[in-house]
From Swiss-Prot:
Poorly processive, error-prone DNA polymerase involved in untargeted mutagenesis. Copies undamaged DNA at stalled replication forks, which arise in vivo from mismatched or misaligned primer ends. These misaligned primers can be extended by PolIV. Exhibits no 3'-5' exonuclease (proofreading) activity. May be involved in translesional synthesis, in conjunction with the beta clamp from PolIII. It catalyses: DNA(n) + a 2'-deoxyribonucleoside 5'-triphosphate = DNA(n+1) + diphosphate. Mg(2+) binds at D10, D105. This is DNA polymerase IV. Belongs to the DNA polymerase type-Y family. Binds 2 magnesium ions per subunit. The lineage of its organism: Bacteria, Bacillati, Bacillota, Bacilli, Bacillales. Its EC number is 2.7.7.7. GO terms for biological process: DNA-templated DNA replication; error-prone translesion synthesis; SOS response. The gene is dinB. Signal peptide: none annotated.
Length: 356
């Protein structure tokens, strides 16, 4: 069996780039696409110029205004992004049927069957990026490797408009020198916990035994052990069907303050709504999950007559569910919000602002 060749393609600051393409006056400017600061809107995408001010996705737009008061704030145009995405996905499928979309602007492609001695995977990735630019006038970054984890890692290494290959010749050096926070799937809480264990780099992670990582991180420990070694056997799944969309947050310290927890639930509702929008889905169930300081998992779910998609609707239901779940005497270490029973969303007379 030939060695797998996987490409991960990720569009560069997708929503902001579409806006800059359609309005050349925005080129080179700090462009922030997102909800309005007057409400509780959040940033969906920030151009690289805006990121230099500390603006990033999922940040409250009001906070972005403080960091970048002279930025160009743009109300999202979902149909424009959807049109560009359809062209991009069609290009992927013109190369291979084994395409796993992750969102409107990101996908895995298994091109193992296309690779020949005179046609390496890196050249195929170059062709794909060229075709995307010619069809949309948008740049993309791609990572090429022998598994999904490394391909995704590679795609983020030379952004924007970059191409990176990770193979057996350079994988060890790349992983060993990687900051632990740059490993896909390692969030702020996990990073802080790793720092407490003197794990700062890929080398430090590599030096941990699998048993110790499982003791520290539960089931995730096995995956972290493999990631430090560049191991990922997961296939590219072209018929991937999502049954739910959700977001969880593990706190750096156990939390018992309702106001802080509800703020986190609002942020999770925003993130979940944004992911629903990218997947063009809405859902008829909302679930809130908490994990106590004793690692006890509790959850509440509500089934709905009409599907929900906006962050406000999701939050209002999540608020009620959390109120039913909470015990004032019990600190919690994790909270999650999930929308399930998904169906195709209807977008008539709507913009992506409904989801941000």
């Amino acid at each position: 069996m030939s060695e797998r060749r996987i490409i991960h393609v990720d569009m560069d600051y997708f929503f902001a780039q579409v806006e800059m393409r359609d309005n050349p006056k925005l080129k080179g400017k700090p462009v922030i696409v997102g909800g309005k600061a007057s409400g509780r809107g959040v940033v969906s995408t920030a151009s690289y110029e805006a990121r230099q001010y500390g603006v990033h996705s999922a940040m409250p737009t009001a906070q972005a205004h403080k960091l970048c008061p002279n930025g160009y704030y743009v109300t999202p145009r979902f149909e424009a992004y959807k049109t560009a995405s359809e062209k991009i996905m069609n290009i992927f499928k013109s190369y291979t049927e084994v395409v796993e979309p992750l969102s409107l602007d990101e996908a895995y492609l298994d091109i193992t069957h296309l690779v020949r001695p005179d046609l390496p995977a890196s050249r195929i990735a170059q062709y794909i990026r060229r075709d995307i630019y010619e069809a949309t006038m948008l740049t993309s970054s791609a990572g090429v490797s022998y598994n999904k984890f490394l391909a995704k890692l590679a795609s983020g290494m030379n952004k924007p408009n970059g191409l990176t290959v990770i193979d057996y010749r350079n994988v060890h050096d790349i992983l060993m020198g990687l900051d632990i926070g740059d490993f896909p799937g390692v969030g702020k809480a996990s990073k802080q916990k790793m720092h407490q264990e003197a794990i700062y780099t890929g080398q430090d992670l590599y030096n941990q035994s699998e048993r110790d990582l499982i003791r520290l991180f539960g089931k995730r420990g096995h995956g972290l052990y493999n990631k430090a070694r560049g191991i990922d056997h997961n296939p590219v799944k072209p018929t991937r069907i999502r049954k739910s969309v959700g977001t969880e947050r593990t706190f750096a310290t156990d939390m018992n303050d309702d106001e802080e927890i509800l703020q986190k639930i609002w942020e999770l509702s925003n993130k979940t709504a944004e992911r629903l929008a990218k997947l063009q889905k809405s859902g008829k169930t909302v679930t809130v999950k908490i994990k106590t300081f004793k690692f006890e998992s509790l959850s509440k779910q509500r089934s709905l007559r009409d599907p929900v998609r906006s962050e406000t609707d999701i939050y209002n239901i999540a608020y009620d569910l959390y109120t039913e779940l909470k015990n004032p005497e019990t600190p919690i270490r994790l909270v999650g919000v999930t929308v399930g029973n998904l169906e195709k969303a209807t977008y008539e007379n709507m913009t992506i602002y409904d989801y941000i």
